[in-house]
Amino acid sequence: MHKNSLLGQIIYTSIMSAVLLMACLEWFLWLAAFLYCLVKVFQKSEHWSINVLCIIVGTAFVLLRVIFLPIMVVTLPLPDAIAKLWPEEMVSFLQWFAFWAFAILLTVPWLFCIYQVVTNQLGRTKRMKQVLDDVTAPKVVIVMPCYREEPEVLIKAINSVVDCDYPPSCIHVFLSFDGEEEDNLYLNTISQLGVLLKTESHPRSIDVKYRSARVTISRFPHGGKRHCQKVTFKLIDRVYEEYLKRNDNLFILFIDSDCILDKVCLQNFVYDMELSPGNTGEMLAMTGVITSTTKKHSIITLLQDMEYIHGQLFERTVESGCGSVTCLPGALTMLRFSAFRRMAKYYFVDKAEQCEDLFDFAKCHLGEDRWLTHLFMIGAKKRHQIQMCTSAFCKTEAVQSTRSLVKQRRRWFLGFITNEVCMLTDWRLWKRYPILILVRFMQNTIRTTALLFFVMVLAIMTTVKKVDDLPVGFIAISLGLNWMLMLYFGAKLRRFKIWLYPLMFILNPFYNWYYMVYGIFTAGQRTWGGPRADAAAADSHTTAREAAEQAEKQGDELNVVPETFKAAHEARRAASNRESTTTSELGRTKSVIRPPGKIDGKFSARQKTASGMYAHPDEMDISANDVEKGRRGTRGFFADRDSLDSISSAQNIDLGVSTPRRMKLLMNEEDLRKYQLGQQIQNRNSGIDDAEGIYRQPIRTPSAFPHAHSASANDIPLHDLGANDTAAQGSRSEDIQRFSEGRGIGTRADNGRSRNVGNSSFASRMAKRTPKTSR
């Protein structure tokens, strides 16, 4: 027995020594990295309040970290020979302090999460009691940038969108290819979507109807994901410009091309943002729940699955309860279009070109989603306008290899810590979201303490310590509270593998330790050692984005020279415009640490004016002449939501995008018959009946359509079909009058603003009322 006990102590001491060294290194590196970011923010600050907060936050952070260091030592189950060296009074006080400090820091967020789970429905269940149709459902445009995606993955993503339990006529997918080449991916995709054109080259933008939903397929010059989203937004803005003047029920959803939407994802998003009882229409942005899926299961994919669920349903739900989420991921984010439109020029600016060093590169490029969320948080006028929708789900493919996972998590870590410090030093966030920022700060102080729990488990396994000798309450709070939530989440979502949360509780600290140490050392090597000889740099011929892409292709996204980005950008702008070599944006010698003050409160929804138009408060001075001019230049209040309403007013505006060509205009009669036959087959396969009579309309050859004015020889807009049909206008008026008198979905009792008026498809209304009369 004595030999076994001695052997257990030897094994325990040897393992514990290594783990303790790891914990100390992690403790020091996190402190050093946080202070380094504070110093960089202090050096780059554009306002004195940033410097003051740097000092206050830095001092408080160091003090709390220093206090937790002796707590870590006395809490560890050290051998008795060592534990006897500590004064009993000091040990008792520190353990008492540790218990209550961690209890508060863990229990308070847990209670916020419980409150959010109770007050908001969790799960993939339909929340709408009424059936949405093309009148009551708000319009949703989905932006899906695509670059070198697997064809079957892309088609699966598109199908998940158009097959959502949402009126197809209210779905408009913008599938944007990041590149103008007509490669196999593009040709295969348009073929799958029913494009039967056999030409040497296709229009840069094509409109098709796929499973009763509208899909706009576009090819843009290669510029990266954010640039692709930018030019797509310009196209959307051009399409719906006039529609937005008379409606504020247009929403834009950003998703990745490998994301699979849940069946009720769109409906639940819209319910929370617009249609829930008592909704005032002030919700501006929401993110959903992104879960991982995989074809090949492993311990890595299992940990990712549990981490995704815990990180979103716990951490983001807590943030949502405190006032706002701090990260709107580009993989699943819905925004109110009229509000986002005011932020677009700040949202889509090329942040990489403003980088001066690796700190800026990590903040604006690696942590782009967090930086942009910071932008929205300042732009919002009040709390709880940027939230988490716990009933909108989508799936994305989990990372399969350890190498790819480490690179991904290094990117996340560097983007997180740089943006976290920027948020903690922005007094506007402390003023608007005090509880949120305080919770974020306190959680940062207790990071990197998870390895201690492994030591406690090891002590029990090696019988060096008894359970009575360990801080059981300490373990019960940290593990027990989280495990209870994961048990509930697993049962609610029927995702029972997340019940293995204790496995993640033990293993994840080691993975997180490696992610952080690897990220800090590689970033530090780049910062103090200088760039490698093959590092990508920007110059007069290479943009910052191209340099970043070159580094990613080489397998190391940190192998760049961000010090060259801003200088190269200024040189190119000076060469392109000799008369104005500087701007207000470039006149500053230091990079921007926080969003500019002029966006404060700018992220807001439009309000209805006396003239029936929608405008922001600072746009309310529209004169009667302007309103009348707008009426004469558009199709009127009852605009057909399926048309490109803004084309007539935007023909002479060069936005650098191509107006979509309606595919029917490019077909001969035989191809058109094949296309409509394919549409009927798609319709049957997707389970959608032809109640609206869409396919019973007579076939119209290209010659049957009137000639359309186009911005260029290659760009033909969709036509204003039926715009002069007075009978249709009368039918629309009857629809709106009847629907507005009832207080159902689509009306708002507080200000009398009716939603979605006249939004039903013109073709569907004509088919219902005069089935024998063609459009």
From Swiss-Prot:
Induction: Exhibits higher expression levels in hyphae than in germinating conidia. Expression is increased in the absence of chitin synthase CHS2. Residues 532-603, 702-775 are annotated as: Disordered. One of its GO terms (molecular function) is chitin synthase activity. InterPro entries: Chitin_synth (IPR004835), Nucleotide-diphossugar_trans (IPR029044). Residues 577-586, 754-763 have a biased composition (Polar residues). One of its GO terms (biological process) is chitin biosynthetic process. Its EC number is 2.4.1.16. It holds the Pfam family Chitin_synth_2. Disruption phenotype: Does not affect mycelial growth nor sensitivity to various stresses. PROSITE patterns: PROKAR_LIPOPROTEIN. Glycans are attached at N724, N759. It comes from the Eukaryota. It is an enzyme of class 2 (transferase). Residues 542-556, 732-741 have a biased composition (Basic and acidic residues). One of its GO terms (cellular component) is cell septum. Polymerizes chitin, a structural polymer of the cell wall and septum, by transferring the sugar moiety of UDP-GlcNAc to the non-reducing end of the growing chitin polymer. Shows additive effects in septum formation with CHS1, CHS2, CHS3A, CHS4, CHS5 and CHS7. Involved in virulence and mediates mycotoxin deoxinivalenol (DON) biosynthesis via the regulation of the expression of TRI4, TRI5 and TRI6. Belongs to the chitin synthase family. Class VII subfamily. This is Chitin synthase 6. The gene is CHS6.
